[in-house]
Amino acid sequence: MSDFIGVYENAAPTEYCERMIARLEELDTTTSSGCRGEVANGGLGNRKDVSFYFERDDQVLAQETNQILDQALAKYMDEHPALGMSQFYSQVVKVQRTPPKGGFHRWHAEQGSELSSATRCLVWMIYLNDTPEGEGMTEFIEQGTRLQPKQGTIVFFPAAWTHTHRGNPVYTCEKYIATGWYYLA
């Protein structure tokens, strides 16, 4: 039986990943439109990261991201044909840098009762850099699965509670991802 976690290595070109990281760093020094997440203790994890929404801050890279995702999504849909019966779209391209010991380590699902997340059906994520073995893994509690970040790998998984997950900490490097959601139309 499938765990519905689609992992597609080398699906995003190295050059694209490097441009995404460079653009995030550039935006972080030239604009205030980024979102800085900082939460300490209180059971909420230790979140310290910076994110930019490229559909607002860099439409060219956002469009390129969607083209790359379309190719990998076609493979995922071949493996899960029932998904093709739904109409859905992705409009958010969130690019995120997590520093050593930062991140959001609390178990969570991407679909919730709030209007902004209620219609999320599928999560996508692109690892933009490698992390050392055992660092920065994405962990799924129900599936007992841990994914090691590897540059260019695209991951898809359902947004519902069945795929409750967390990002495990990096200790020796920064972790870069692009992420977003497919929404039911």
Q: Where in this protein do the model-derived segments appear?
A:
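Fe(II)/2-oxoglutarate oxygenase catalytic core
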Residues: 1-154, 162-185
